[in-house]
């Protein structure tokens, strides 16, 4: 789930659903946090479909971040899925732009905005972008290695941009593995609050859990997973795994959208700060 604030407690939640060919498309629902269990509007259909055959996103697209640029323009950063041969899949970050306040989106480029490079030779995906005074920061998932065809290891790194489209990377790691058993650090979600940068992310040894980190400068981070504020449920759709958290603050209360068992097969969960 990728939320966008619309005002008065209404949030647009971008999500990916799969078709009969198991290809993900991006759609959205509007929810009112004053009535958090009520969906008030659905998109008429997907706002972004898989790319052309042979492109980095020809087998699916998943939303990662939405930024309102003003004057009716929005930037949708997304994950592009492409099946592999020697490895199970390739994942790269893309960008789509809306000039009609989010009614429709068009790709900025048919190529990824974060492709392979000398510091990131494997997958580069799940971009979360924040606007800063002199440009943009991106927190993204970077492949560290493939243990075998079906098991990649990936951590969270950082990139910088003046325009939000062209990115510079130096390999700086923001969130690294706790130990050798940890193989996945996924979906960074970053906010600035109370003079601190705060990040929620997913981490996995056997089953996904939601982690948390803080930073003074947005560059160097300290993991404090015990402060994530949530664990698996006792029963139900999230009793085995939880992942892909997105946290918003409304009326001095935090709301967390997240996925549960089997990567969200039952839909999107909502947790409310006590």
Language-model features and meaning:
Residues 1-59, 67-122, 130-186, 191-240, ...:
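Beta-rich carbohydrate-recognition and catalytic domains
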């Amino acid at each position: 789930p990728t939320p966008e604030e619309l005002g008065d407690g209404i949030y647009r939640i971008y999500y990916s659903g799969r078709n009969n060919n198991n290809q993900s498309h991006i759609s959205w629902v509007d929810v009112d946090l004053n009535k958090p269990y009520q969906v008030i509007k659905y998109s008429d259909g997907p706002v972004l479909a898989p790319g052309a055959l042979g492109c980095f996103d020809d087998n699916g697209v998943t939303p990662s971040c939405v930024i309102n640029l003003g004057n009716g323009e929005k930037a949708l950063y997304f994950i592009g899925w492409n099946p592999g041969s020697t490895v199970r899949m390739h994942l790269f970050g893309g960008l789509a732009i809306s000039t009609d306040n989010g009614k429709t989106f068009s790709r900025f480029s048919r190529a990824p905005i974060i492709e392979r490079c000398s510091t990131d030779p494997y997958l580069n995906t799940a971009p979360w972008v924040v606007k800063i005074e002199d440009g943009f920061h991106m927190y993204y998932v970077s492949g560290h290695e493939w243990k075998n065809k079906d098991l990649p290891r990936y951590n969270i790194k950082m990139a910088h941009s003046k325009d939000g489209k062209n990115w510079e990377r130096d390999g700086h790691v923001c969130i690294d593995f706790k130990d050798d058993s940890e193989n996945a650090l996924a979906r960074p979600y970053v906010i600035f609050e109370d003079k601190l940068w705060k990040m929620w992310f997913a981490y996995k040894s056997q089953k996904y859990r939601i982690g948390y980190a803080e930073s003074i400068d947005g560059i160097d981070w300290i993991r404090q997973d015990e402060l994530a504020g949530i664990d698996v449920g006792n029963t139900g759709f999230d009793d085995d795994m939880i992942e892909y958290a997105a946290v918003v603050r409304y009326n001095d209360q935090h709301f967390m959208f997240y996925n549960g068992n089997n990567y969200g097969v039952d839909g999107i969960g909502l947790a409310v700060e006590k």
